[in-house]
């Protein structure tokens, strides 16, 4: 896997080199906006909504619309807010894994050890796993500092970026307290027990992506068939033209040739055979 970031993990005075690689991989078919007529990609131009002028990169700035006006923020001002050019996953504390609300968990990366840090890496992973702990770390990513958890996953360590606490909304609704009888609770517990099993993420495939891949593959196959049919048709027209020229030169009279049909085959029999074939195909897919 291609590394997104290279640096080190620091815990107190202990430090070892690592590299970050995304846990999630891009997969499936990607769709783009295209011109329906010729398939050309649609490009979006940068146009000012006030004057209608198309802008170049040098004309662009960042700004915040406060309602009373637009406040421009210059690149130099943003540079002062960005993370220092550190290359360290600085673990600042350890906490019980159960105290990290799953709502806070964001994108995840594998922490891959690099020599000579495999020993320290393995010790940290084992300590976290035995203690049911996660490390809370500050990490410079994509030009700004983020907070992340470092946790064991199987035989490796995973760094998972946390959403900022102030970005999490509390529910703005109240659920009325309902009094549940023992019978209802017992039935619910029985239902939940009957449906309880070990979670296997592979048992829940991405049906949309698989379906989209099939749609695109079928269309590509259809295009190939159409192209082959067109080539055969064009080749047949060329042969027919050559034969016509030869017939004209030798003055061979035209002969009407009746359309051929398989022996004993009638239009109704063919239709019935097609229906039976389709029913057999459908039955095989059930």
Curated annotation (Swiss-Prot):
One GO biological-process annotation of the entry reads: double-strand break repair via nonhomologous end joining
The GO terms this record gives for MF are:
double-stranded DNA binding
Q: Per UniProt, which keywords does this protein have? A: DNA damage, DNA recombination, DNA repair, DNA-binding
The record ties this protein, via InterPro entries, to: Ku70/Ku80_beta-barrel_dom, Prok_Ku, SPOC-like_C_dom_sf
The ranges of region (Disordered) come to 226-270
Gene3D superfamilies per the record? 2.40.290.10
- One Pfam entry for this protein is Ku
Give the compositionally biased regions (Basic and acidic residues): 226-242
Which spans does this entry mark as compositional bias, Acidic residues? 243-254
User: What sequence ranges are listed for the domain Ku?
Assistant: 10-175
SUPFAM superfamilies (alphabetical): SPOC domain-like
UniProt keyword annotation of DNA repair present: yes
Its job: With LigD forms a non-homologous end joining (NHEJ) DNA repair enzyme, which repairs dsDNA breaks with reduced fidelity. Binds linear dsDNA with 5'- and 3'- overhangs but not closed circular dsDNA nor ssDNA. Recruits and stimulates the ligase activity of LigD.
Subunit (UniProt)? Homodimer. Interacts with LigD.
UniProt record similarity statement: Belongs to the prokaryotic Ku family.
What is the name attached to this protein's record? Answer: Non-homologous end joining protein Ku
